[in-house]
Amino acid sequence: MIQQESRLRVADNTGAREILVIRPLGGSVRRSAGIGDVVVATVKEAAPGGTVKAGDIVKAVIVRAKKETRRPDGSYIAFDENAAVIIKANDNDPRGTRIFGPVARELRDKKFMKIVSLAPEVL
């Protein structure tokens, strides 16, 4: 589970490399977030010449999490790293034009279709 102060790898080409979670969105007492949840974060590390720079406040959706997620058929999915994709503030479209690495199938259920279509692999 992703919580406040968690550091996530960025899985898109916006120029950000690492973000730090400020807060998971969805309720005033929400403590943690999982795959498909939206978080508010700050960019901690960024590549020069990117569309975002270090210190920017962004919204991101979690696409990979180390903590296993249970699926309706009883199986579990877990990844080797915690990763997110930066999205636009007003809708669920990604700010970047490419997605790196696999993403979870749960994103399709949560209406992040553009991220699913850009991803090289959906697990």
From Swiss-Prot:
InterPro entries in alphabetical order: Ribosomal_uL14, Ribosomal_uL14_bac-type, Ribosomal_uL14_CS, Ribosomal_uL14_sf
GO CC annotations, alphabetized: cytosolic large ribosomal subunit
Chain's role: Binds to 23S rRNA. Forms part of two intersubunit bridges in the 70S ribosome.
Name of the gene encoding the protein in the UniProt record: rplN
UniProt superkingdom: Bacteria
GO MF annotation terms: large ribosomal subunit rRNA binding; structural constituent of ribosome
Subunit structure: Part of the 50S ribosomal subunit. Forms a cluster with proteins L3 and L19. In the 70S ribosome, L14 and L19 interact and together make contacts with the 16S rRNA in bridges B5 and B8.
Keywords from the UniProt entry: Ribonucleoprotein, Ribosomal protein, RNA-binding, rRNA-binding
Gene Ontology annotations of biological process type: translation
Family, per entry: Belongs to the universal ribosomal protein uL14 family.
Protein's UniProt name: Large ribosomal subunit protein uL14
Matches recorded under CDD domains: Ribosomal_uL14 (cd00337)
